[in-house]
Amino acid sequence: MSKVFKLHSEFKPAGDQPQAISKLEEGLEDGLAHQTLLGVTGSGKTFTVANVIADLNRPTMVLAPNKTLAAQLYGEMKEFFPENAVEYFVSYYDYYQPEAYVPSSDTFIEKDAAVNEHIEQMRLSATKALLERRDVIVVASVSAIYGLGDPDLYLKMMLHLTKGMIIDQRSILRRLAELQYARNDQAFQRATFRVRGEVIDVFPAESDELALRIELFDEEVERLSLFDPLTGQIEQVVQRFTIYPKSHYVTPRERILQAMEEIKVDLAERRKVLLANNKLLEEQRLTQRTQFDLEMMKELGYCSGIENYSRYLSGRKEGEPPPTLFDYLPADGLLVVDESHVTIPQIGAMYKGDRSRKETLVEYGFRLPSALDNRPMRFEEFEALAPQTIYVSATPGKYELEKSGDDIIDQVVRPTGLLDPLIEVRPVTTQVDDLLSEIRKRVAINERVLVTTLTKRMAEDLTEYLEEHGERVRYLHSDIDTVERVEIIRDLRLGEFDVLVGINLLREGLDMPEVSLVAILDADKEGFLRSERSLIQTIGRAARNLNGKAILYGDRITDSMARAISETERRRAKQQAFNEENGIVPQGLNKKVSDVLQLGKPGNRGKGRGKGKAAENVGQYKNLTPKALDQKIRELEAQMYTHAQNLEFELAAGLRDEIHQLREQFIAIS
């Protein structure tokens, strides 16, 4: 059954959107491998991409440069496609300290990591959707280029059940154990199963709301049903069901035994090399560590750091690329690279950093050379694997422009009629006093101001100066974690303060329609923060306001400033001509502040009496750090299961609604 993408929106494509949609679709149908959508801030790039996906009906992966932007895109796509599979695939580590060795101080650092269970469940849900259906959009971070379990082995491990199938209970239980599910008759949670007579309840690893009940009679599957694990209420009777492994890295027993033999051969060869070079300590260390890992694999089927042996487990040859999320994407899939000027360089950088750390581990006998093949994809491997690609950015990089050639689609005209900000260049000598008078003009009419400086020191001094002069100002810097950053931007929009000072505000990627003035101090100092691309991005922060204006403080106009001003004026002129031609009066954006943290509407979950109470309770946790929030979710889950065991289903359901909302908040801030 192949479902079709169904786009839900109260708006129709307008402005430059219709021509951008038709050009992108035309290019994809003509087989173009690379296209670039050059869309200005506020022109509805996500809506354009959503229309292309819906019209062509192809499974799509959207790559975002960080978790914050991925969460925002996921929320938007969920709203556009509520009836289709919109999935979220980012790193599931809350904390990650990779294995490393520092030769200068002879210090070995053990791997240490904390995995977030909810994000792990969403990753499993993403790969399941890609394997089962075509109406899929996976919003991913650069985590997508890191090694994942081999899709062929993953498919072989699945347990298919159908009504009327002849299979005995012990066979089902054995297969569940092979899939790394644990039996737990007391606390029924994700990736566990329980047995009651001839009834087996399984909580699938990729599900967060429904579990499977298998009812057997005389070694035959009599009935398969999906039920609410909290209340026990049957939601749906199904004819067939596929149980997926608990992890992407599950490997069949025979493959593990085969891998162990290959590891022994490689260990013997490596020992010879180390002894020949008189590296006795390294040889002893490697032998001891590898033999311990082999013993663990033999007894348990896995070991700590098993990813370092992934080459043997997936049957790859030395130097071959690891299987990644791209291997799960169908051949006719589509790749959308959002904020491509940031994302593309990130993909290229991942491999090199990983490689240098691993080479030290191999050289000093902590790992076999095969550990070097547990790595992210190299950039050229990414290029070879990537399907037809659309790069989306307001300021595309050199790579995208070269690859796209003439296939660059402009989306400069905004449907709202909003013009790009007016730009003024003013002298540096009086920049602080001039800025203060401009801020006061904006505050008087309830508008907000962004100020970007070159150094941390200057940002701190400016914040202090503005505070002394009675302005409500906050300072955004790298030491502030994601949750606090989102809160600061939310407070700016709500009017808790009027001025936000920062060094690199263009990275936020969050919409702030209340901002009417962007002030760029020391704009004439050439460099990374004052390049043409950075200036256009920063100026664009005021492009969602009717009175948008950017002031560049500089004693001369640099080449970067000239190009940024010229490009902004070109876009402004094009928008103005469109407005006059179509009789459009520019309208300010009126985006609800709650939208900043919203992560896709959670469907029909939690309707009813407990919902308001849940929302009320969630409010008291809004200032928690991601780590504290994760701990709170675990505590509430434990309480929920206790209520369910005591048959207090109303209390359990209320806690479940609260947990759902906290999880959405957690993903938005992590």
From Swiss-Prot:
Keywords: ATP-binding, Cytoplasm, DNA damage, DNA excision, DNA repair, Excision nuclease, Helicase, Hydrolase, Nucleotide-binding, SOS response. This is UvrABC system protein B. Forms a heterotetramer with UvrA during the search for lesions. Interacts with UvrC in an incision complex. The beta-hairpin motif is involved in DNA binding. The UvrABC repair system catalyzes the recognition and processing of DNA lesions. A damage recognition complex composed of 2 UvrA and 2 UvrB subunits scans DNA for abnormalities. Upon binding of the UvrA(2)B(2) complex to a putative damaged site, the DNA wraps around one UvrB monomer. DNA wrap is dependent on ATP binding by UvrB and probably causes local melting of the DNA helix, facilitating insertion of UvrB beta-hairpin between the DNA strands. Then UvrB probes one DNA strand for the presence of a lesion. A motif (Beta-hairpin) lies at residues 92-115. The keyword Signal does not apply. It is found in: Cytoplasm. Belongs to the UvrB family. GO terms for molecular function: ATP binding; ATP hydrolysis activity; DNA binding; excinuclease ABC activity; helicase activity. ATP binds at residues 39-46. Residues 630-665 form the UVR domain. GO terms for cellular component: cytoplasm; excinuclease repair complex. Its main location: cytoplasm. One of its GO terms (biological process) is nucleotide-excision repair. Residues 26-183 form the Helicase ATP-binding domain. It comes from Serratia proteamaculans (strain 568). Residues 431-597 form the Helicase C-terminal domain. SMART domains: DEXDc (SM00487), HELICc (SM00490). The keyword Signal does not apply.
